[in-house]
């Protein structure tokens, strides 16, 4: 995690212009659990990080975070949080995609959902088209409403399969 084990780094990142931070990237860190592991939830240090991010004005991004950790961040945060780039698991089951319940929960708590166009996570995988992306937007909007949805591109092109396999591992 960018903050390592230093709560003071949060304010430094804000001073450097950072406005949104991933709480986890696919795997466990000192804050909580990513989407590719058994989810142990938000840690005590994670609660401190959420509080400090709220204080300085950095938004918590839960795109790569596990379900339990996400729920606990949403409940802990005094400010809106986001899934800046995700897709609904109702159209394709994948650890990075979010369930209907997760999408509704974040929207019900004032959060935001950015629908990504990352083809491997769309309904038809790498064979997906713009129509599949439009379907994902409509599906998500029917759950969260038009005020809690946007475009969360996470656009990656020009890379081979090895790069995408690398993306599923811890950074």
Report the location of each language-model feature.
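Short acidic/histidine-rich active-site segments
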Residues: 144-166
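Extended, charged catalytic domains and RNA/DNA-binding interfaces, predominantly
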Residues: 1-126, 134-141, 148, 170
């Amino acid at each position: 995690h960018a903050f390592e084990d230093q709560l003071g780094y949060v304010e430094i990142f804000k001073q450097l212009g950072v406005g949104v931070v991933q709480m986890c990237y696919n795997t466990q860190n000192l804050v909580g659990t990513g989407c590719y592991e058994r989810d142990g939830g938000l840690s005590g240090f994670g609660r401190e990080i959420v509080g400090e991010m709220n204080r300085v004005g950095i938004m918590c991004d839960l795109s790569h975070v596990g379900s339990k950790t996400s729920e606990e961040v949403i409940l802990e945060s005094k400010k809106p949080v986001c899934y800046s780039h995700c897709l609904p698991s109702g159209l394709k089951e994948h650890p990075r995609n979010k369930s209907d319940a997760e999408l509704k929960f974040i929207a019900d708590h004032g959060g935001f959902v950015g629908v990504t166009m990352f083809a491997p996570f769309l309904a038809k995988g790498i064979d997906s088209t713009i129509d599949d992306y439009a379907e994902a937007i409509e599906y998500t909007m029917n759950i969260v409403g038009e005020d809690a949805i946007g475009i969360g591109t996470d656009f990656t092109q020009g890379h081979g399969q090895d790069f995408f396999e690398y993306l599923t591992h811890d950074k």
